[in-house]
Structures are given as structure tokens and as C-alpha cells.
Amino acid sequence: MSVVPVADVLQGRVAVDSEVTVRGWVRTRRDSKAGISFLAVYDGSCFDPVQAVINNSLPNYNEDVLRLTTGCSVIVTGKVVASPGQGQQFEIQASKVEVAGWVEDPDTYPMAAKRHSIEYLREVAHLRPRTNLIGAVARVRHTLAQALHRFFNEQGFFWVSTPLITASDTEGAGEMFRVSTLDLENLPRNDQGKVDFDKDFFGKESFLTVSGQLNGETYACALSKIYTFGPTFRAENSNTSRHLAEFWMLEPEVAFANLNDIAGLAEAMLKYVFKAVLEERADDMKFFAERVDKDAVSRLERFIEADFAQVDYTDAVTILENCGRKFENPVYWGVDLSSEHERYLAEEHFKAPVVVKNYPKDIKAFYMRLNEDGKTVAAMDVLAPGIGEIIGGSQREERLDVLDVRMLEMGLNKEDYWWYRDLRRYGTVPHSGFGLGFERLIAYVTGVQNVRDVIPFPRTPRNASF
């Protein structure tokens, strides 16, 4: 007799007539007049629970089994048999049921009802992984993360752990969380009356990172191909379905690569991970297609088969200006394309994923390589049907003199980036990379509309509970 995951029983990895033990939580219990109870027991290893058939001849049947309610934790031992009922191939004929933990008051158990609103589940984020929806999201999140690591490992990339605490603003937007141990009730001041960060823990003003890119570039310029994957932070006061204050970013960086190289890398990566999730999480994806977004599976299948379209930003603006559609946000050369513009291009004009390249320099970051025209930079966005931008990237500016001018134009102090500038002084090379917001990827895959529901504990303006 061995302890096995529920997934092994349901997916036929345990021989019929084997004695096994499963451990998990009760989803439902129903009793028949014939003195038999049916427990649906789940352990999170797969979408479906396993049915345990319990005869009233068990010594603790009346005392324990008939008191079991949703959420109680149990250890069930018995024989794996072919299930005569519909819905699953195998079930367990229980010979022993142990109760590991009771639900104190079943009537007030927050997960007692069968269906809950997504808004309610955010209020009980510590219990919501027990629901079908959030459990499925968690497994898909895991599978996507593993597939990303696998893809980059197979491509010869090294994973680099970049710091979460930094003194540099990658985006130059200033929307950063400050990290400080100073006493807010008694702040030290310098001669100008400003806060004296010399007295702070790090001896200078420090922040939570908005991106691992700048640090990643240093390792790409030594190891050739690297990627970072970890949490990032933005102090944007944005209460939208697409924004979080804390989220995960995947950022590959490749030496000797140009914009077209990383556009190809982005396409290969997305198709790889979409194929992986369809193959490895078929039961969860079936649930999303049935209960969340009927297009969840077919959308990924179409994406995998599609040839990516490519268009210059200037041509994209012309397409939008001449399409006959009245957009909420006006279209003109120099505007940062909004979600409605991106989705029109991907869903209606090209009817495929689109790589938009060569954006105006004034709407992009200082580190993006200036093109020959002096007006645009070698930047790209990957637009996906159904969501719009899913990846943003660029060829990095490897010319020190041009980089310095760009920093000056954007009001950045180049001395703050002395180490980043050193990369251009000592064996500079063309190099490129992109960023993928992991939660937006999960939302795209699952069809879940709000990124707050694809991360375990969302951090948003005025909310850092749990």
C-alpha cells in the first residue's frame, strides 16, 4: 500500500485492485439509502476529485464519515477499482477513512457554497485556492513557469537572479517603491532640509525594482544568453484589470542579437509554452473553455499555428488612420498605441499575432537603440488577438555617446548609471531583449479577465492583505 496523488488514480497510473492511500480535502459527500456514502476527495494534483465509496460497515462510519462536510481533510485507504458510474474511470473502495481535520462550523465555512463571485474570492484569498477556478489557475501558472524555464534551458540560456532592491530606475518613469529603514517620525535632514539618505540602510535612496533588465544586460555581456524571472514592482495608482503593484516578469537578454532576432525568440517561446500547457494541463484547460472562456483552448491552438505578422509602427498608424473605425483614443504618429488600437491590428486587420517595430523615440525608454532616422528606436511589441500587447522589447543602445544623449534628453543623471555605461566602454556589443508580464500571459491562457485572479495574493493600491 502506498500514498499516491489523486491524479495518479484518475489518470490510470495505478493498477486496478491496488491498495492505495490518498490524502486530501472533501469537496462533497452524498449518502445513499443503501448505507453507502460517496466522498469526492481532491488534493490539488489535478482538476477532478476522486470518488471514495464508503460502506456503513466501517467502524467510524456513523461517528466520522456521516459528519464530513466540504473542506474537511481526510486520509482514505482502499482498493482502486473501475468506476461503474459516469464521469471517471476509476474510484476507490474505501477500507479505512481517517479524519485529519474538521471544519469547525460548516455553516460559516467561507468556501461552503458551490459557486462564489470572483470579487468575493479576493476577500478570502487564503482559502480561494480550494476552488476549482483558482486551483486550476495555480496549476496552469506552475506549468507555464516550468515551460519557460525548460524553453530557455533548451535554447542555451542561463537563468540570472537579479536584485529586487536597486538604486536605478530602469524605465525612467519614477513610479517606484522606496526601501528605507529611516524612522518616519524622525527623518534625518541635510543642510538643504531634504531627507538625508546617507543615514539610511544602504547609504543612498533605494527602491524595489521595476525590472531586472539593466542588471540582466551585464550578464548577457558575459554569458551571451541569459534570462531573469522574478517579481517586479510598480507604484502606479492604477485600478485596472491589467495592473498589479507586484507582478512577475520574464526578461531574456541576448548578446550579438538584433531586433529581428528577439522577435523570432519571442514567437518561438510563446508557441512552446502554449503547446506545453495544452498538453500538460488538458483537464484544467478544458475547465477554462467550459466555464471561463469558450475560446481558451482554440485561441492557443490558432496562436501555435499562426505565422506572426510584422509591421512598422509608422505603417500601423497609417492602417489605423485609414480603417474607418472611430477609436476612443485618437490615432496619430507619435501616440503610444492603446489596447483598442493593438487589438484592432491583431484581431481585425492581420487576424494573427503581430510584431510592431520601430516606435517613436519619445514614447520609449532611454536604453532603446536609436535608428538611423533619428526619430525612431529599435523597439518592438508583440500583440496577441484577444489581449493586445503581451511582450515588449528592443535592441539596446550599445553606443555610449548616443546613450548619454538619450539620458540627457530624458532628464536622467548619467552618473547614476555609471556601471550600465561601463558595458559600452569595455567591449560593447549589440544586444537585445524583451519583457513578458507573467500574469498577463496567464490571463491570456486561461481567459481569466483580471490579473488579480492569476497571482496568489494580489498587491494593488490600498490592498496588501494576507
Swiss-Prot record:
Homodimer. SUPFAM superfamilies: Class II aaRS and biotin synthetases, Nucleic acid-binding proteins. Belongs to the class-II aminoacyl-tRNA synthetase family. Gene3D superfamilies: Bira Bifunctional Protein, Domain 2, Nucleic acid-binding proteins. InterPro entries: Aa-tRNA-synt_II, aa-tRNA-synth_II, aa-tRNA-synth_II/BPL/LPL, Asn-tRNA-ligase, Asp/Asn-tRNA-synth_IIb, NA-bd_OB-fold, NA-bd_OB_tRNA. It comes from Shigella dysenteriae serotype 1 (strain Sd197). GO terms for biological process: asparaginyl-tRNA aminoacylation. Its main location: cytoplasm. The gene is asnS. Pfam families: tRNA-synt_2, tRNA_anti-codon. Coiled coil: none annotated. This is Asparagine--tRNA ligase. GO terms for cellular component: cytoplasm. It comes from the Bacteria. GO terms for molecular function: asparagine-tRNA ligase activity; ATP binding; nucleic acid binding. CDD domains: AsxRS_core, EcAsnRS_like_N. It is an enzyme of class 6 (ligase). It is found in: Cytoplasm. Transmembrane segments: none annotated. Keywords: Aminoacyl-tRNA synthetase, ATP-binding, Cytoplasm, Ligase, Nucleotide-binding, Protein biosynthesis. It catalyses: tRNA(Asn) + L-asparagine + ATP = L-asparaginyl-tRNA(Asn) + AMP + diphosphate + H(+). Its EC number is 6.1.1.22.
